[in-house]
């Protein structure tokens, strides 16, 4: 978009600056942010799960520049019946009126505790990351599914259980003719990075199943990888993605029996499966990409009318 962007990793700064005088490294973080702003003179500060940034720091920055805009994006689930409901709501509301806008991957109207000036954003795709075209390959496996016990947690956590395991195990039991490729459960470790890309390249279809009860528009960022790499993507209809993604781009299902029927249907119908997969990838990369999401964030934060169309902005 032509903007000059300076990224600061709060976690890296904290990790490198723990000492007797700064036990958790957070004092150094606040000073680094303020000093950096003094040199960089940003027009906008965008927070992304930066839980260690103090409200007092933002207050000081806004006093330095009355025109400074501060916004945040938040990708974790916010549904009342989802994981970490209380914790996530405390995190997202931490800075209160110091924020000019908030962007979430859940429909704001479906969140129990309303967030001022909040907007929905989809999990963005990026053609530099989503590079596969699985619909052009004869994939070894039918259905890919991956989960973990935490963001980028490298291995399974002992004693940790996820309700999705029950659903997936039941689905596999009902469909023994479907070749599943499943990670993050049943003693199979999660996959990340380049290894994830290698594994996902071997499946023609993917199941987008997030933690907790389905809530309107919420999905983990896995959805961008499924669509973006050309897998036929299956999504619970209660998520309501058909509000802005055409029905010829993915497959809705309403329960495990419906999902089983459709898995078998598209396992057999390669032509239709590949047609939908290709349409889904084309749509997601064109209309739900990182450039458009970035423009949307800035247009709402600075209140300007963009020349772009945002299909998710109803």
Residue ranges and their predicted role:
Residues 37, 61-62, 96, 200, ...:
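Short hydrophobic patches on amphipathic alpha-helices
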Residues 71-86, 94, 102-103:
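Glycine-rich beta-alpha loop elements in corrinoid/cobalamin-binding modules
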């Amino acid at each position: 978009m032509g903007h000059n962007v300076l990224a600061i990793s709060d976690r890296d700064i904290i990790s490198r600056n723990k000492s007797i005088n700064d036990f958790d490294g957070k004092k150094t973080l606040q000073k680094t942010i303020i000093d950096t702003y003094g040199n960089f003179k940003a027009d906008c500060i965008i927070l992304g799960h930066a839980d260690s940034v103090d409200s007092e720091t933002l207050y000081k920055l806004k006093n330095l520049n009355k025109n400074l805009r501060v916004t945040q994006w938040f990708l974790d689930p916010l549904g009342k019946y989802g994981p970490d409901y209380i914790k996530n709501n405390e995190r997202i509301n931490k800075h209160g009126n110091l924020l000019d806008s908030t962007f979430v991957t859940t429909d704001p109207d479906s969140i129990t505790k309303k967030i001022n000036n909040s907007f929905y954003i989809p999990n963005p795709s990026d053609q530099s990351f989503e590079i596969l075209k699985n619909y052009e390959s004869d994939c070894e496996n039918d259905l890919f599914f991956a989960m973990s016990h935490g963001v980028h947690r490298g291995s399974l956590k002992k004693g940790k259980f996820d309700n999705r395991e029950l659903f997936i195990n039941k689905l596999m039991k009902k469909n023994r003719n479907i070749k599943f490729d499943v990670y993050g459960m049943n003693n199979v470790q999660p996959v990340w990075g380049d290894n994830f890309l290698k594994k996902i390249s071997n499946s023609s279809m993917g199941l987008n199943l997030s933690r907790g009860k389905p809530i309107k528009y919420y999905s983990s960022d896995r959805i961008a990888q499924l669509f973006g790499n050309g897998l036929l993507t299956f999504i619970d209809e209660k998520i309501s993605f058909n509000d802005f993604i055409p029905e010829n781009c993915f497959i809705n299902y309403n329960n495990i029996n419906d999902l089983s029927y459709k898995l078998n249907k598209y396992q057999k119908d390669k032509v239709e499966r590949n047609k939908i997969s290709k349409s889904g990838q084309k749509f997601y990369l064109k209309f739900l990409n990182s450039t458009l999401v970035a423009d949307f964030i800035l247009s709402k934060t600075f209140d300007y009318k963009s020349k772009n169309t945002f299909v998710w902005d109803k």
